[in-house]
Amino acid sequence: GSSVRPFRMYNALVNLGYDVKLLEGQQNRRKERQAKVKEIINWLDENKPDICYVEPPSGPFFNQIDISLLKKVHNMGVPIGLFYRDFYWRFSKWAWKGTPLWKQSILKMMHRRDLAAFKKYCDVVYFPSQECTKVLADVKFKEIGILPPGCNEPKGGVKLGAREIFYAGG
């Protein structure tokens, strides 16, 4: 799921001997999240990392402080790479079934706000595959990269009999 890649990325960097400052925490635990982000912001007042890698939540940022953190890191001149996988909200046919219109409107607005921040502050936005980049072709990111899923590749081909599949993992 959505926790596999961050776990593997973190372990790979640590195993390569890098010092990694980790920010983790759930968006829906507002006070805890804000405290953890403030701790990183304070750390950044005394430290400048070489790079910043971001795995956004599966959904929009609910805490404005996360976008403020991206802005601070960007303004420090630290290159930011962000992995974007949760664009299911762009598929109205599946994403919003049973969701009240008022809630759809608010969440879509928050997703668009996040995309604008990613476009402005991130040096490269990574997607799981080249095919995924087509979903957001209208957003002109500075650079796009491909970062395959953090899983073991299956041996042999995978055959599916379905004509249409929509999978929103996590």
Label for each model-derived stretch:
Residues 1-27, 47:
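N-terminal subdomain of nucleotide-sugar transferases
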Residues 155-170:
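Conserved donor-binding/catalytic core segment of Leloir-type glycosyltransferases
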Residues 131-132, 146-156:
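Short beta-strand->alpha-helix junction loop in the catalytic core
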Residues 71, 75, 103-124:
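Membrane-proximal helix-turn-helix segments that form the acceptor-binding/catalytic region
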Residues 51-52, 71-94, 99-105:
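Active-site proximal beta-strand in glycosyltransferases
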Residues 42-66, 77-83, 124:
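Short N-terminal targeting/anchoring amphipathic segment
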Residues 29-47:
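Glycine-rich, highly charged phosphate/nucleotide-binding loops
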